[in-house]
């Protein structure tokens, strides 16, 4: 194995023995350390432990596979260098043992253990693991059966439970509560015991005992937090009052307020409940502010406007402090505790019944799984525990495993739950001197509490174990901190440190961010003066959605909040509702969220386009070993959740021309293709379902339109569509109602139902069919198919039925022809796969499958669209922060930082906590009234604190994904006001970290980010210098704040340096001419669009027709008609005869490519002297034949077209590592150069940039000739080379009246910063062998193209182009065209 230079802490983690907890920060190389530790013990001469005697537990199967691969690679490298026969034999043996080594997830380990000892727990050895969908359905069925039994028994306790937790309509809320409670209990080591102890939380006889309990301590903490927030606000009010011109007469009252709240905080800390109540009554009694006008300045120096502002802001801060105490009153003091005690005991009885029913359900569910011979995922862990422990002591199996495993290594230890922790303890040795548990993780990245992960397990060891000090030795239990980051640039690391030193505290984030936790730069990024590498500040983009008009992209007006970076305090802005949690079904809130997301998406898209199209900076490509420009695939957009905004972002990115892919867990069932197939399945199962039936009739499966559907419905206004379909199929045909007809029974059933009105119905049917025969055709085609499918559904499997429907209807092929066809087909295949998996369970049948899907959706669950994007595709990816964990990306955008944290889970009447148990309200069953309980408040408060700590860690995970650049985006209502608030919060904090109470009061990520950035010494918000900014850790970190008051591209943005540039560069003169023509053009005098123009004839013909129409209208108007009627008729006539005034814009292309322009110019050159008749038949069209991708059966052939070979050569040249080879190329022998180039081609194939066929089409000699040629010398010697430079220009073509967007990609731009000039280089693979004058041919073919390239470089890069160079690979020769020469070719087509 290679011997990297390990840091002292890493070496200690590799060498030391005992029970070790390695706190490995983001990017610290934890996986490499774990692999090296394992490898060292396998290969050490003294130890030489076989690899299968280690248990390596990973979080995912992918991580296990990667670990196994890394160990295998290390063994292979060791084998290559081994000299001794014994060593070779040992390594070969380890290579063979590797495939049976226990490198696995904990679930897989438990599975193997159960399969080995199944007989001890009386489990069938052929058991299978039910997937989550099957388990959900089985749980639901079991619980419904259990409820039926309880209802039959009519027990009062159960009835009280139903009355307390059900509704007046059903008992679904109670069922949901029991399922949640059962799931939560199964994450405990002893679920039964945990459930039995739940009523104890409600058994209290003394207030003092309650207040000293864990629940009481949480209540105290909640009061302290709110009081602390109130004190911060009062401090702000006080500071405003004492400013020059401020309301100094407020100061005595504010001092008294602070004193009373301070006393309340003290009592909440250590007083009795009576003390707290008394202190609260005093604190909440805010006296009125004095009305005096005492001032601290002479009248001559007072600015009345400023004085009024200070008075209002001071009063507002005090009013907000009052609200904090109002929140305490509405929660802790809403019902006096003395009144709660007797109710709490009654609630304890209710909780006891709930626990008993849940335990009963657990037993019945276990029986149901045994009957089906399946287990769920929680069973795997609990069965393993059953095998490993008895009466809480290790079994023989556990002792055997402890003796067998040399060491147990656990990755991602911060994400395990108590059950998993117990399993690991039982299979590892714990006694001093023999401990062999090695744990790796980072509690700052523990973000899976919703999966029952308990970061407290990590934190307890982290706090109790001694920490390794450099030079120190081993200890029985030891923490080793790895904080050197080998992933990110120093600018990224310093920014992360600067932020989290201030906002991650033990009270708010459950761990303090200190010197041990802070990241230290370890990655090496070469800074080449000739390259624009990615070092730069972390950008923070903020906007007020209420201040931007989305339709215009401009700020709404002077009445809106001022958001300028230079003067955020000046504008008051409109009063907008804020800090309101969106409620379910709140359409206005949802629309507002969508509009905010759309604004943010446009801002993000503009920033990405600027970065990519303008080649703003280069990133380091590890595989290439060189720097290259940013590509879309290098960019990821992280969000807390994609559910509600992914589609909005995708839509805006597509408009901006940015390829994008969002992998979500929603939206699948809402797609048209899936909805149509599910509707078809529903009517196959039950044709009486009208809504699905109508959906199928309107779909391409039948093809009826709305009118036809209406005519069908008119047959039986009170019936259903199935009956109308049968009647239409029958249509009075006597043969079809005879007994021998294949659909006799179906037709006779419907005819018999409507026997009395049958004659009238027959008349109706015949009338419809006479007037609309196409209805009969469609019904005759569909009805027999429907009957055949219904018959098939009863005798074939669900999966077979579904695939038969795809083939029989051709629907799978049909959706492939629609836009996004590949995605639609993938979605339908996912549905088929879901049907296959469903039938692998004990459930069968179409009805049950549809019922399963309905329940799945009714629980708010969904599936994401099928993934059709590969890892190597050049697209911007949207992923959630949770999905990004463990990954890294060159450029990271973090969006949605202004979105409020989701607190919906805290609104449930049943709250669950592993230590505090169940929190329910005080329920008056008789009167059906609920009151908040102190236990519920305590559980809710603790859950909120833990949720906030997790949100803080989620932010840390998001920020640490970035390797080279970070861009943060968020919205803030009343942005100017918020910035002032952030400043006040920052001023009131004398310490490095903000107070816990303030941090726990956050509603959005910006509530943490804003105050921290305000303190930065660079004065990011232009508010004036901050007193203690330079004393903050990592205060030298680089940040840039951009405050947007308009959407990028529509107007300027205000920021510390410069505004964003335009991406598309329009021809200003052309736009001006267009505006002038619009002002002077008269509607009605333009030619109608869509007609072939015959010179001298069209206009007169149209005028004649218009005149005749007008005369006909006048002739039909009675002479007695009044003037208003005639005017109305003239207005109707005018509107109906209106013609679009700019027909030329309809018939021309709005966007074209350089290649298309080149093709058209060549056609005009070839046809300049052709006859009109010949030219009219072959002239180029804006709607030329599309160029489709080659079919797979052609692509897979070895032969490539010349164009495909040219593309392959261009790709190989584009990715040549010029900077890496520049200094050594001339010194290398020819065979070494050829070997390097061959490896370069092979690398492109491995990275899927080239296919194997394309790689074979690239000649090593071609690449070597280029690098050794005059053109190659230009590339080596250029100060900066930019390859594959995309551009978009707005140009006025001589052949068109309207401007057109022209897009293209330049092969290479060679920049000389010293001379301030550029050269354009284009690589051509045309076969020019035998051409007498290749220079003339290339000039004629590509003069226009190079002229456009030169124009693009000069406009985009603001650098004059000296000359254009064509390198012909077939001739190994360059041809130089001066700027003046290509200009002539350009001006023949473009108005410059």
Swiss-Prot record:
Family the UniProt entry places it in: Belongs to the helicase family. AddA subfamily.
Database matches in PROSITE patterns: UVRD_HELICASE_ATP_BIND (PS51198), UVRD_HELICASE_CTER (PS51217)
Stored InterPro entries: AddA (IPR014152), DNA_helicase_UvrD-like_C (IPR014017), DNA_helicase_UvrD/REP (IPR000212), P-loop_NTPase (IPR027417), PDDEXK-like_dom_sf (IPR011604), PDDEXK_AddAB-type (IPR038726), Restrct_endonuc-II-like (IPR011335), UvrD-like_ATP-bd (IPR014016)
Cofactor: Mg(2+)
GO molecular function annotation: 3'-5' DNA helicase activity; 3'-5' exonuclease activity; ATP binding; ATP hydrolysis activity; double-stranded DNA binding
Top-level division of the source organism's lineage: Bacteria
Function: The heterodimer acts as both an ATP-dependent DNA helicase and an ATP-dependent, dual-direction single-stranded exonuclease. Recognizes the chi site generating a DNA molecule suitable for the initiation of homologous recombination. The AddA nuclease domain is required for chi fragment generation; this subunit has the helicase and 3' -> 5' nuclease activities.
Residues holding ATP: 24-31
Catalytic activity from the UniProt record: Couples ATP hydrolysis with the unwinding of duplex DNA by translocating in the 3'-5' direction; ATP + H2O = ADP + phosphate + H(+)
Sequence ranges assigned to domain UvrD-like helicase ATP-binding in this UniProt record: 3-489
Assembly behavior: Heterodimer of AddA and AddB/RexB.
GO BP term (any one): double-strand break repair via homologous recombination
The protein's name: ATP-dependent helicase/nuclease subunit A
Protein keywords: ATP-binding, DNA damage, DNA repair, DNA-binding, Exonuclease, Helicase, Hydrolase, Isomerase, Nuclease, Nucleotide-binding
GO cellular component: cytosol; DNA helicase complex
Boundaries of every UvrD-like helicase C-terminal domain copy: 556-886
Pfam families: PDDEXK_1 (PF12705), UvrD-helicase (PF00580), UvrD_C (PF13361)
